[in-house]
């Protein structure tokens, strides 16, 4: 019997983790992105620069802005220019947002911390190391893929308009 782990096994594991995180956000009545923004803003002390959210999350700026709009529409956050800036914005939790985060988001975060804490310290370091290595290599492969596609597209575009004098 073959006991080798396959990429399909790994993908299923990652999909399962994504599903669990989605269950946390769904239980709070928020999208995955809005939930993440709420947790990050709360753990940052109640205010966080939008630029920090966009640099630390792998969502598009449009998705992050939509999530922030949801939080502001529900009365959980405000969005204002950073002090002394006419460009950079800061998300701040309202009192209602702080209460919501304490009641729903932070207990979910504590559950995640307990799950990570169930791993031995050497297991914690190993999982971080391995996932970091996999992410780096996959990111490099993605960059190479995008360069290949761009080169193919450019070659196809250069070929357009050329005619054959047959």
Task: Please place each PLM-identified region on the residue numbering.
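C-terminal regulatory/oligomerization modules of transcriptional regulators
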Residues: 1, 122-166
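N-terminal leader segment of winged-helix/HTH proteins
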Residues: 1-28, 162-165
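Pre-recognition alpha-helix immediately N-terminal to the DNA-recognition helix
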Residues: 9, 36-40, 99, 126
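Alpha-helical linker/hinge and terminal dimerization helices associated
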Residues: 10-13, 17-21, 57, 100, ...
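N-terminal helix-turn-helix DNA-binding core of bacterial DNA-binding proteins
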Residues: 19-63
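Short, hydrophobic-biased segments on the C-terminal half of alpha helices
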Residues: 50, 68-69
């Amino acid at each position: 019997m073959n006991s080798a782990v396959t990429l399909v096994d790994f993908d299923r594991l990652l999909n399962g983790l994504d599903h669990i995180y989605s269950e946390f956000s769904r239980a709070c009545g928020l999208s995955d992105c809005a939930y993440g923004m709420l947790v990050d803003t709360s753990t940052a002390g109640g205010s966080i620069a939008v630029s920090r959210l966009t640099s630390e999350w792998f969502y598009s700026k449009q998705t992050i802005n939509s999530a922030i709009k949801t939080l502001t529409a529900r009365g959980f956050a405000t969005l204002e220019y950073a002090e002394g800036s006419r460009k950079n914005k800061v998300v701040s939790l309202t009192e209602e947002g702080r209460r919501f985060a304490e009641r729903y988001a932070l207990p979910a975060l504590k559950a995640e911390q307990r799950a990570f804490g169930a791993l031995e310290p050497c297991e914690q370091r190993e999982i971080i190391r391995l996932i970091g290595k996999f992410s780096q290599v996959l990111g490099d492969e993605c960059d190479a893929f995008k360069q290949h596609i761009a080169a193919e597209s450019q070659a196809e575009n250069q070929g357009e308009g050329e005619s054959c004098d047959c």
